[in-house]
Amino acid sequence: MFDFEQQLKILPDKPGVYLMKNSLGEVIYVGKAKILKNRVRQYFQKSKNHSEKVRTMVKHISEFEYIVTDSEMEALVLECNLIKKYRPRYNILLKDDKIYPLIKITLNEDFPRIICARNKIKDGAKYFGPYISTGAVYETMEVIKKIFPIRDCKLNIKKGNVKVRPCLNYHIGLCKAPCTGHISKEEYGKIISGVMDFLSGKNKDIIRKLKEDMDTLSENMEFEKAAELRDKIFALEKIIEKQKITTGGFEDEDFINIHSDEKDSCIQVFFSRTGKIIGREHFIIEDTQDLPKGEIVANFIKEFYGGTAYIAKTIYVPEIYDVQLLEDWLSIKKDSKVYIKIPQKGDKKAILNLVEKNARTTLQNFKLKFIQDKKMYETSLEELMEILNLDDIPHRIEAYDVSNIQGVDSVGTMVVFENGRPKHNDYRRFKINEVKGANDYESMKEILRRRFQNGMEEIKRIKERKLEFSAGKFSFFPDLILMDGGKIQVSAALEVLKEFNIDITVCGMVKDDKHRTRGLIYRNEEMPLNRNSNIIKLITRIQDEVHRFAVTYHRSLRSKRVLHSVLEDIPNVGVKRRKELLKRFLSVENIKKASMEELISTPSIDMRTAESIISYFRGYKS
């Protein structure tokens, strides 16, 4: 039994990180402290200043751990890493941990290329962005390639040493073919300078020059070429139009603001590059009632910039906690000075107000859709209760599926819907261990046995310790079980429930010959469902989700197995390097497509190893 009184007494008066755990040993909160003794003790002192969220969390704390650091900066870095590792339920977590793509010009090559990059590294290249999506990157790159005839091949072209046959791009005017010596390094460099001017926002001169060329072609009655230039100008202006809002500066800036209602918050980020707003992103953060705005913004910055590939030079916010600490942390990550500013008036304040207005609108729309969806889900669940003759609405529904190819890499999955909505934190994946070959019936029984055996054991441990109930991985049992399949799958589930003496309604989800959800199998009879009903929409969504989750897990296992076996054959790639490649690129296809720069930027991969990998895949037949 954890002795709170004793552990609170011996807390050190040093900086560090603390981890709060529930009765099942799961980390439910990670925080940092300038003085551990003071910060951790605050949670266990009765105070009206505690938010509802903190009071709820404290009820579920069964023990805590702490890690002492040499400085508050070290504590901040460790806190960010541990939050990413454990994803604790009471920390502010962004719905997606995306890395925003960049446009990279490989100035470290004699004849540079323009490519999409995920990480910014010190390799002599020039980076622009970040962009809001890879779609925005490729759209911009396509326009650039139409206007500026630069190469997009992966040939290692050195000045004067490569003579090959030019590719199709040369013949259709999209490349000057430096691979054949048709253009000098100096002339090619002028084209690249134009690309960098465009990406830096110096667009007026480029458009003016294109229009002059178009007029000249028209005067010379070369109307076809003039029309081509007209289309290029239109495409260029279309890209520029998307960056119409200006910020009055020429540096890279991010504008962050927040709007909160009585329960939730929306944080909006505007990305400004060289004085133009190039994109925006929003994040809905739930259960922020009673939390100060400055604390929410500080926590958001830690998570958002902890994962992004690019940090702007200046970040504007309405208010914030730990501003100096966060500035220092961001500056270390960027390797140059980063400023966090709170504008009081002027253009920056006006833009920040615009960001807040957008956050307010986004939150209102989110809530409106939530209410509309809630009504639809309630209707669906009520209909489901009626047709199955249940005593109550099935608030928690669990669905199961099995996936394999000829019995190889057999996996099972469980998805959870609460009140009609997916509860992703409760999704579970199972490797089939005991069943050999393609046997869906026995595989399904293995999955369900493990699920309910784990649930019974968790509940027993909680009761034995006489602790307040805390949801573990399997502690909550469903009101309804849906099997992706027919009578065989339903029979497997009922047999396992009988073993555990558990009474839960089980249905099978069946599809028609067009692979659309058709109806439910219940008590050995098929119940057809109206294609326009709310209930079929819910069942279809659940069936599609459990199937997607199963297939995705199966593919990931298969990909890892194939990747592992392939990498074993590559010279200079040992166990450590295989792990790093797998961690970075995830699939064999991504490894095969990786550029020299991307491979070298992977931990433990040097130039010799990268060349070995590229050489191997040139001769590899998948």
Curated annotation (Swiss-Prot):
One GO MF term attached to the UniProt entry: DNA binding
InterPro entries assigned to the protein according to its UniProt record, in alphabetical order: DisA/LigA_HHH (IPR041663), GIY-YIG_endonuc (IPR000305), GIY-YIG_endonuc_sf (IPR035901), GIY-YIG_UvrC_Cho (IPR047296), RuvA_2-like (IPR010994), UVR_dom (IPR001943), UVR_dom_sf (IPR036876), UvrABC_protein_C (IPR050066)
GIY-YIG domain ranges (all copies): 13-92
Signal peptide: none
GO BP annotations listed: nucleotide-excision repair; SOS response
Taxonomy, superkingdom: Bacteria
Residue ranges of every copy of the UVR domain listed in the record: 204-239
UniProt KW keywords: Cytoplasm, DNA damage, DNA excision, DNA repair, Excision nuclease, SOS response
Subcellular location: Cytoplasm
Pfam families reported for this sequence: GIY-YIG (PF01541), HHH_2 (PF12826), UVR (PF02151), UvrC_RNaseH (PF22920), UvrC_RNaseH_dom (PF08459)
GO cellular component: cytoplasm; excinuclease repair complex
Subunit structure and binding partners: Interacts with UvrB in an incision complex.
Family to which this protein belongs: Belongs to the UvrC family.
Purpose of the protein: The UvrABC repair system catalyzes the recognition and processing of DNA lesions. UvrC both incises the 5' and 3' sides of the lesion. The N-terminal half is responsible for the 3' incision and the C-terminal half is responsible for the 5' incision.
Protein name as catalogued: UvrABC system protein C
